[in-house]
UniProtKB/Swiss-Prot annotation:
Organism ancestry: Eukaryota, Viridiplantae, Streptophyta, Embryophyta, Tracheophyta
The protein's name: F-box protein At1g54550
InterPro entries cross-referenced by the UniProt entry: F-box-assoc_dom_typ1 (IPR006527), F-box-assoc_interact_dom (IPR017451), F-box-like_dom_sf (IPR036047), F-box_dom (IPR001810), Gal_Oxase/kelch_b-propeller (IPR011043), SCF_F-box_component (IPR050796)
Domain F-box: start-end pairs: 1-47
SUPFAM superfamilies found in the cross-reference section: F-box domain, Galactose oxidase, central domain
Top-rank taxon: Eukaryota
PROSITE patterns in the cross-refs: FBOX
Length: 362
């Protein structure tokens, strides 16, 4: 009698490509052969291309995964399959509280809340690498994860030395397992704001000063305007333009060409939120879309932010996902209750996560 171990490797790989990434544990526990194949063949390549998104976020000082399936939207049932769960980090570091997470090339850079260490984690392979900083971490430190032209991964750390004009840049090289200091003068205000994205090894962000890449619209000059960065399946940059205290028109642009000193943009979606029927009165009124991603095929964007609900005695915040699209489409889903101190940490740290086979030797 034939079993799953008798299936040809080509057929197994085709099965792997259609199974969602969230089924990885079940696949690996099926048999030793499937477990071995999953270590050098990525699961869910075709499934991920069919309106299924896997993201990561930090909530309650723990790393959580958020899975969102948009295949059922704009249908007769108009179903949205959304789930969030805390995920375990292997190698006995699961109890470490995390304050920040950065993403690049399928890897997650996790910063310990007690500022003791940094850790790089490959969720797909289940591998981690603990890295001791050259100097003790500071809560104002900024980080970026990327790689060079030879695919050597590196960590950039911007050390806050007590003054906005006293910033040191450390670089950790995975290949040499060592830190070095860059001899560069930089003002703290030139560094990235609340969100940044990594695309093909480079990190992009909005800074208050310094050279700007061209945009389709004028960069915000008033305090109530907001720009949020994202990327499209590690292929293109995307930017969301919105208002902080009132939602009028939102605009999403995607890059068509990226050069070292120039980016070409095109408008993907422009929506007048005042024309949407059933839009809640408090829709992102007291916050903003901290992160977002979108589905090019279905012409919808998923905006993540927090909404405040004020009761007679208490005030509560909910992490919310809002799906908006052309022709007035709108649907909102409350994800979970969060505390005020967690609002910044609840933003997504990857846009349409794609697994990686990058080995972490630790």
């Amino acid at each position: 009698m034939a079993t799953v171990t008798d299936l040809p490797d080509d057929l197994v790989r085709e099965i792997f490509s259609r199974v969602p990434l969230t089924s990885l544990r079940a696949v690996r526990s099926t048999c030793k052969k499937w477990n071995a194949i999953s270590k050098y063949d990525i699961l869910g390549k075709k499934a991920a291309a069919k309106n299924q998104f896997l993201e990561f976020m930090v909530t309650d000082s723990r790393v959580c995964s958020l899975r969102l399936d948009l295949q059922g939207i704009r249908s007769e049932e108009d179903l949205i399959d959304l789930s969030i769960k805390q995920i375990s980090i292997p190698n006995k570091v699961d109890q470490v509280e995390i304050s920040q997470v950065y993403h690049c090339d399928g890897l997650l850079l996790c910063i310990a809340k007690d500022n003791s260490s940094v850790m790089v984690w490959n969720p797909y392979l289940g591998q981690t690498k603990l890295i001791q900083p050259r100097k003790k971490l500071h809560r104002y430190d900024k980080f970026a994860l990327g790689y060079d032209n030879n695919r050597n991964h590196k960590i950039l750390r911007f050390l806050y030395e007590g003054s906005p004009r006293n910033v040191i840049i450390d670089v950790y090289d995975f290949s040499s397992d060592s830190w070095r200091v860059l001899d560069i003068d930089i003002d703290w205000h030139e560094l990235f704001s609340h969100n940044s994205v990594s695309l093909k090894g480079n990190t992009y962000f909005f800074g208050r000063k310094g050279p700007r890449l061209p945009m389709l619209f004028k960069p915000p000059s008033r305090r109530f305007e907001y720009l949020t960065l994202s990327c499209v399946r590690n292929e293109k940059l995307a930017v969301l333009y919105s208002h902080l205290n009132r939602f009028g028109t939102i605009e999403i642009c995607i890059s068509t060409k990226i050069d070292p000193s120039a980016v070409s943009w095109t408008t993907f979606l422009r929506i007048d939120m005042t024309l949407i029927n059933g839009l809640p009165d408090n829709f992102f009124v007291h916050s903003y879309a901290t992160s977002f991603f979108f589905d090019e095929e279905k012409k919808v964007a998923v905006l993540f932010g927090t909404n405040r609900y004020r009761g007679r005695e208490t005030c509560q915040y909910y992490q919310r996902a809002c799906i908006v699209g052309d022709s007035g489409y709108f649907k909102a889903v409350n994800i979970e209750l969060v505390f005020n101190s967690q609002l910044q940490s609840c933003q997504l740290v990857s846009s349409s996560y794609v697994p990686s086979l990058v080995q972490l030797q630790d």
